[in-house]
Design a protein with these regions (language model features):
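N-terminal catalytic cores of secreted or lumenal carbohydrate-active enzymes
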Residues: 1-118
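The substrate-binding groove and active-site-proximal loops of carbohydrate-active enzymes
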Residues: 1-2, 7-14, 50-76, 119-132, ...
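Alpha-helical packing segments of well-folded alpha/beta enzyme cores
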Residues: 77-88, 130-142, 160, 164, ...
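A general structural motif
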Residues: 91-93, 98, 150, 214, ...
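Structural detector of well-ordered beta-strand residues that form the stable sheet scaffold
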Residues: 97-99, 154, 176
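Aromatic- and acidic-residue-enriched segments that line the glycan-binding/catalytic groove
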Residues: 109-119, 170, 191-195
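CE4/NodB-like, metal-dependent polysaccharide N-deacetylase domain
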Residues: 120-157, 250-271
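Active-site-adjacent pocket scaffolds in enzyme catalytic domains
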Residues: 156-292
Length: 292
């Protein structure tokens, strides 16, 4: 496939782009949201698309019809995504989770005010009904599009607090994921601070109980290995990245064995935001990280 570089001489210069340049940029912007391997039919459920392949090979000078062709193909492919998700969930291959509808920071909604670092006071009441509305709206949309109601949740920005446990539990969310730093700042039932450097603590789901008895199982992601996938492995060869990943897991497993624990009774959580995948696309340009 052709790697396009639109008028490199214009970068950091006073040269103006013309209408054709902007049209080329539009087409390339949408075109490169497709994987070249996908449009060549090399992925499961993908089909060979000669029209897109021709546009990949064309060195600019695109037309408005070309732009519409690419956008229409995007719509066609996106229409297949949710049905495929539903199929995978129905077969038990994956579990799909929801997130609050408008990406609210739920702990802030639950707080009755706070003082910012510059000393400015934010005065507000606690808004648990807002939290529930975001959750229910997100779950309703999920059910409408996928055909079933989720029981797991990714909190916006992984932000959690004791106060939000009740509204989350009340809407039927059974489990959620957040960061190991939250666990590090938490206490067990005996009031002891939890040491996340102990493998059996981090690689274990915890049952979090709210003030009124609501319960939500919570897994705390291993930040080290999650961040390696998000930010480091994209600069390594697939072989080196996989070797590092497996070695890390083996070390956790050995720590559990040394502590007299059964590794099969533990769960190590790797969690990262979807937009971090951009860091995975540099695997020596090998098939958008598929070898990994």
């Amino acid at each position: 496939m052709t790697l396009h570089n639109l008028k490199p001489a214009t970068i950091m210069s006073d040269t103006l782009l013309n209408e054709q340049d902007y049209l080329d940029l539009q087409v390339l912007w949408y075109l490169y949201q497709f994987s070249p391997d996908y449009v060549q039919g090399e992925y499961d459920a993908s089909h060979y698309d000669q029209g897109l392949i021709d546009l990949f090979m064309q060195p600019g000078q695109y037309t408005h019809a070309d732009l519409m062709y690419v956008v229409d193909r995007q719509h066609d492919h996106m229409a297949n995504v949710l049905p495929m998700y539903s199929e995978l969930a129905a077969s038990g291959q994956v579990e799909l989770t929801t997130t609050p509808y408008y990406h609210p920071i739920m702990p802030l909604l639950m707080m009755d005010g706070w003082t910012m670092e510059d000393g400015i006071r934010v005065n507000k009441e606690s808004w648990p009904e807002d939290v529930q509305n975001h959750l229910i709206t997100g779950m309703d949309l999920f059910e409408d599009k996928l055909g079933f109601r989720p029981t797991g949740m990714w909190p916006s920005e992984e932000a959690v607090s004791p106060a939000m446990v009740e509204p989350v539990s009340d809407v039927g969310i059974q489990w959620m994921v957040t960061d190991e730093e939250i666990l590090m700042k938490s206490t067990d039932l005996d009031g002891n601070m939890i040491d996340v450097d102990i493998a059996s603590n981090l690689a274990t789901p915890w049952l979090v109980t709210g003030a009124d008895g609501g319960e939500v199982a919570t897994v705390f992601r291993d930040r080290v290995i999650s961040d390696r996938i998000a930010f480091q492995y994209g600069t390594m060869t697939p072989e080196a990245a996989v070797s590092d990943f497996i070695a890390y897991l083996d070390n956790i497993r050995q720590e559990l064995l040394d502590a007299g624990e059964d590794p099969s009774e533990h769960l190590l959580t790797v969690a990262l935001d979807g937009e971090n995948w951009m860091f995975m696309s540099e695997f020596q340009h090998q098939d958008n990280a598929r070898p990994f």
